[in-house]
């Protein structure tokens, strides 16, 4: 049995979508643009709490060790690189090819292709990881189980926490005397950048749109949403306090966070689809404009934003 076929599919498992044209290991290198610099390691969170299928038959202590091993992270990172190749850089099916049926979501994640891509990446590394098919089989018996863990790895809380940390650090660095208009513009620029410049954000969007009823996708998205809302609630109250903005009694800071988060999500999706953030006739980014429009409805004294903090 070859590396392509061994354990590729657990009996009865089906994945939605259509076939895709995959990139070869010899093609141009694609670096995943994360919220940290390319080439740096992913956050060293405890993957044993996230990956439910890796080394599933091993003893708990052994499973934890395998889940957090450099090789396990490497297999998952390579899988994300291949998904970037197939889903984000894909140009669509070849309509002149009778055998090209389009893109299947996880069709390109064969063991052989993972190893081939790992070897291609290792050629650029000072310390090659030397991944093998045997290492893969020690971790995942079926491709479907690897795919489940890859989804969990992509959506895991540590990545959201890292993004929130990036935005939080940017907010802390804003001068205390910064005018309200400039504060809003700078915060919007950072919020848009941490997603639009992030290949993993694009992959997460593809996965949750393609698999909206997947239990683990739903679980991770709910946790991600709640974490963002909790952060925005605290941040907006603190920033509004700089200018003495008084919230209308019928609203809470949680409401403000819900509204602005929904606006930001829509603006990011639109920008991702069109290639740039939408601008209003005033020249403002659409998210900046929406925030300014909402101020009179949310605050008793919106004129306070025109005063220096």
Residue ranges of model-derived segments:
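C-terminal peripheral helix-coil segments that are non-catalytic and often amphipathic
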Residues: 2-66, 70, 241, 266-309
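Amphipathic alpha-helical packing segments from all-alpha helical-bundle domains
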Residues: 195-205, 215-244
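An amphipathic alpha-helix signature
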Residues: 111-115, 185, 229-237, 257, ...
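Hydrophobic alpha-helical connector segments
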Residues: 162-199, 257
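Helix-turn-helix
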Residues: 97-150
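Hydrophobic alpha-helical segments that form the core
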Residues: 200-203, 248-270, 283-294
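Short hydrophobic clusters on alpha-helical segments that form packing/core surfaces
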Residues: 75-99
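An amphipathic alpha-helix adjacent to DNA-recognition modules
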Residues: 76-77, 137-168
